């Protein structure tokens, strides 16, 4: 079916388009301005609804029209003349059905629909609330104050999710009779309740002022909206909104938080990180016409790979692969990748370098190649260029997030983005950068605790909503919670982008004040250290109880035995799982397994730690007196970063549980073969299932298997070719070099570890992995040392290793390919050298993970 959407740039227009495309329909949108997020798979006509020729072009070939173009008040040019254009074009092109997003203020338009002789439905929406509302409703309620004249007037609302679902049904269900239907969430609000939830004071303002101030006049129009009877919606349509009025308001607070409305615009507060509500499409051409292209060779690119602008050619896997090892699942592409891209939008809005550079940062700070994550080094150069009086290369190298591997390729290619040419303009840019740097450093530092506390509360609320009778949620409710959880994860990554900017800035300042690379201790409240602390607490408890020691020494499953013979220790394990159960290896991969899913893994880690040599106490970093204030701020920001990361992983854990529940339901309904098929759909596809679900899942599973054998290089410029699947392993006497994070010299046998083989690691072995995240850190307790191919000194796992004194080397390029499994190696955590002492004997036990592919 082909569907024309008027008002396509609005909240409803964009949402409808995404849902309709997911279900396999063709969409053409018409609006005055094309949204940056408009998908390339949908047509778009940039024109006013009053342009009869453009409207007729949009209607040509359409089976049905979603008429979302209307304005507040009684503007005949849009509401009447525009609708007349649409109806005339439908009559001339043969389009026989129209769905209009109406309201109590649109009786004349509804009469036009009734008189036109076509099939029509007018969905009279109550005031639309929701976290992704970014229109006039957001601007009105983001005003610094709200008038108190109608404080106790009742107002009805509806969530944008419910509005979009009902509109899709009205568009596609042709047996629905023509006529209007009222849509409002159960329950009622008052303007006083709304103002209190949004933190806006209500002040007495006289009627003359209300009429003169445009925003207040619009609020007065809302006050006069009649209450709607939703009996028809419930009894004839059988539709029950997933959100009640109070929940709509709670969700809408996320749209207003960190923003203020002034005049006809909404601004983000400089000390808060606001919700990113819309992401630019990565495949759209730049404003100057340069079209992006895929960087990989024919047949090596994945469905979700990022086309790149040739003027921004250099990409690096270091650090970002810690977040999500690849090839990741499609579900992760719509959760973690979306979140990282939203973080890029946040960075672009903060730094504002303007022009194609700002747009590039917003679109491709993070990119995907062969379904693996990469960071844009060329864009990072321009981010660093906003720091006054410093060379960009110095800023990037001293940020702590990248290793020396980033220096192996040039930042620019044959084409370069435009730059400031005159000296005067460069000086003006420097003055501007001083202001931007100062506002971001001071503002974000000051607002960081509030952002973190608010996010913790958001995730706690999500968990309560999700796990309150999870199995009994109806499908609409479950789908809305899935979208809410996804968006909380996305906002977690936006907060992470703020932490990235602040941590990088503090690292550069510390480097300048100390004259060397300095990493201050984060202190005892480091949330990412909880897995290590949990293992250490359980080890201490086990050593106090001989029964526990005996049971942990036995093979096989131990948890049930502990429940019977050592109930106190069993309770301690369950208590630790309550704290860290959401974490685990590859913890931001949607299809991954957490400690809560496999508690025996945590018990086995405790048993192995009992047999390991304790790590020495880490040395206390020496901070010069002049640098101590900055070091304290840096440590606080580091702790904030880890809290945000922990809550974001918690939100992923909740989302994973919600998806598995929906996967179970679709398996019972015969849509899926197994519940885990749900991870091979995008989250947005879950709420608008594609036509051939089983075929799509099978194709994506096959693509993931194919991409597992196609590994892009760690760093490349312009284009990439797959890395060789095998390489000559190091021999005895050879040395591999990386970046030393912590610890002295230790010896042990090499164990190549991946998320699914973490259980194979034995006490005293060297944990060698492509990348480690915080979910691996419980295994640090019994590994002799940790070596990773990717990551920087400020990566999450490196921070934990430094806090506890675990020997650790990061950015050891090719470690999983060059270090022979089972070889005895000496790791120097200070210098970053890994020296091969002797190879594994031929008659010795073979260690798993001996393939040499990265």
UniProtKB/Swiss-Prot annotation:
It comes from the Bacteria. It holds the Pfam family Epimerase. One of its GO terms (molecular function) is transferase activity, transferring phosphorus-containing groups. InterPro entries: Epimerase_deHydtase (IPR001509), NAD(P)-bd_dom_sf (IPR036291), PEP-util_enz_mobile_dom (IPR008279), PEP_Utilizing_Enz (IPR051549), Phosphohistidine_dom_sf (IPR036637). GO terms for cellular component: peptidoglycan-based cell wall. SUPFAM superfamilies: NAD(P)-binding Rossmann-fold domains, Phosphohistidine domain. Belongs to the PEP-utilizing enzyme family. This is Uncharacterized protein Rv2047c. It comes from Mycobacterium tuberculosis (strain ATCC 25618 / H37Rv).
């Amino acid at each position: 079916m082909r569907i024309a959407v008027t008002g396509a740039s609005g909240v409803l227009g964009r949402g409808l388009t995404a849902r309709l495309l997911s279900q396999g329909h063709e969409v053409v949108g018409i609006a005055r301005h094309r949204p940056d997020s408009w998908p390339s798979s949908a047509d778009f006509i940039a024109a006013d609804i009053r342009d009869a020729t453009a409207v007729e072009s949009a209607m040509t070939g359409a089976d049905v029209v979603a008429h979302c173009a209307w304005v507040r008040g009684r503007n005949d040019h849009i509401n009447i003349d525009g609708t007349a254009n649409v109806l005339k074009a439908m009559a001339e092109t043969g389009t026989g059905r129209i769905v209009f997003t109406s309201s109590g203020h649109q009786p004349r338009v509804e009469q036009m629909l009734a008189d036109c002789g076509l099939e029509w439905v007018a969905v009279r929406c109550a005031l639309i609330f929701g976290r992704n509302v970014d229109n006039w409703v957001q601007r009105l309620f983001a005003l610094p104050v709200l008038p108190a004249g109608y404080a106790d007037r009742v107002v009805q609302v509806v969530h944008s999710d419910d509005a979009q679902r009902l509109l899709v049904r009205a568009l596609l269900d042709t047996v629905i009779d023509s006529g209007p239907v009222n849509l409002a969430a159960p329950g009622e609000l008052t303007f006083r309740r709304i103002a209190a939830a949004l933190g806006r004071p209500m002040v007495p303002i006289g009627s003359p002022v209300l009429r003169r101030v445009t925003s207040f006049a619009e609020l007065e129009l809302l006050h006069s909206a009649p209450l709607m009877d939703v009996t028809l919606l419930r009894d004839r349509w059988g539709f029950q909104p997933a959100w009640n009025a109070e929940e709509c308001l709670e969700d809408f607070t996320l749209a207003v938080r960190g923003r203020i409305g002034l005049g006809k615009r909404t601004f983000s507060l400089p000390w808060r990180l606001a919700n990113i509500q819309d992401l630019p499409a990565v495949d759209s051409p730049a404003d100057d016409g340069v079209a992006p292209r895929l960087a990989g060779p024919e047949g090596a690119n994945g469905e979700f790979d990022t086309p790149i602008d040739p003027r921004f050619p250099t990409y690096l896997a270091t650090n970002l692969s810690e977040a999500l090892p690849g090839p990741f699942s499609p579900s992760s592409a719509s959760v973690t990748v979306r979140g990282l891209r939203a973080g890029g939008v946040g960075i672009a809005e903060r730094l504002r370098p303007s022009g194609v550079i700002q747009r590039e940062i917003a679109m491709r700070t993070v990119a995907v190649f062969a379904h693996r994550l990469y960071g844009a080094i060329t864009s990072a150069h321009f981010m660093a260029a906003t720091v006054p009086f410093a060379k960009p290369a110095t800023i990037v190298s001293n940020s702590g997030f990248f290793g020396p591997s980033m220096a192996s390729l040039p930042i620019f290619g044959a084409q370069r983005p435009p730059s400031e040419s005159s000296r005067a303009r460069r000086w003006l840019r420097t003055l501007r950068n001083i202001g931007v740097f100062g506002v971001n450093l001071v503002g974000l530092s000051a607002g960081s605790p509030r952002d973190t506390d608010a996010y913790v509360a958001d995730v706690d609320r999500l968990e309560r909503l999700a796990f309150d009778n999870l199995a009994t949620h109806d499908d609409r409710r479950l789908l809305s919670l899935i979208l809410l959880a996804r968006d909380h994860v996305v906002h977690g990554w936006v907060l992470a982008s703020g932490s990235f900017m602040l941590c990088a800035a503090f690292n550069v300042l510390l480097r300048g004040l100390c004259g060397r690379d300095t990493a201050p201790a984060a202190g005892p409240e480091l949330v990412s250290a909880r897995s290590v602390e949990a293992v250490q607490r359980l080890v201490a408890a086990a050593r106090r109880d001989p029964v526990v020691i005996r049971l942990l020494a036995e093979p096989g499953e131990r948890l049930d035995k502990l429940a019977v013979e050592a109930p106190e220790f069993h309770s301690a394990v369950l208590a630790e799982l309550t704290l860290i159960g959401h974490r685990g290896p590859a913890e931001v991969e949607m299809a991954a397994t957490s400690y809560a899913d496999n508690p025996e893994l945590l018990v086995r880690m405790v048993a192995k730690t009992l047999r390991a040599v304790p790590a020495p106490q880490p040395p206390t970093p020496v901070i010069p007196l002049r640098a101590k204030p900055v070091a304290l701020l840096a440590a606080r920001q580091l702790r904030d970063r880890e809290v945000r990361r922990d809550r974001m992983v918690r939100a992923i854990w909740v989302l994973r549980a919600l998806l598995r529940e929906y996967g179970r339901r679709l398996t019972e309904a015969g849509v899926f073969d197994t519940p885990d098929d749900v991870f091979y759909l995008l989250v947005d596809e879950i709420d608008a299932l594609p036509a051939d679900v089983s075929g799509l899942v099978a194709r994506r599973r096959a693509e993931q298997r194919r991409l597992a054998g196609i590994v892009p290089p760690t760093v490349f410029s312009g284009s990439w070719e797959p890395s060789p699947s095998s390489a000559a392993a190091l021999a005895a006497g050879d040395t591999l070099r990386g970046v030393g994070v912590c610890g002295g010299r230790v010896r042990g046998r090499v164990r190549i570890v991946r998320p699914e083989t973490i259980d194979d690691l034995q006490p005293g072995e060297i944990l060698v992995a492509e990348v480690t995240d915080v979910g691996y850190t419980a295994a640090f307790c019994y590994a002799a040392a940790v070596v990773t191919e990717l990551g920087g000194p400020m990566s999450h796992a490196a921070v934990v290793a430094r806090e506890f004194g675990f020997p650790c080397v990061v950015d050891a390029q090719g470690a999983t390919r060059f270090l022979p499994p089972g070889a005895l190696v000496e790791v120097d955590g200070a210098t970053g050298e890994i020296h091969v002492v002797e190879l594994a004997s031929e008659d010795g036990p073979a260690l798993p993970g001996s393939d040499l592919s990265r």
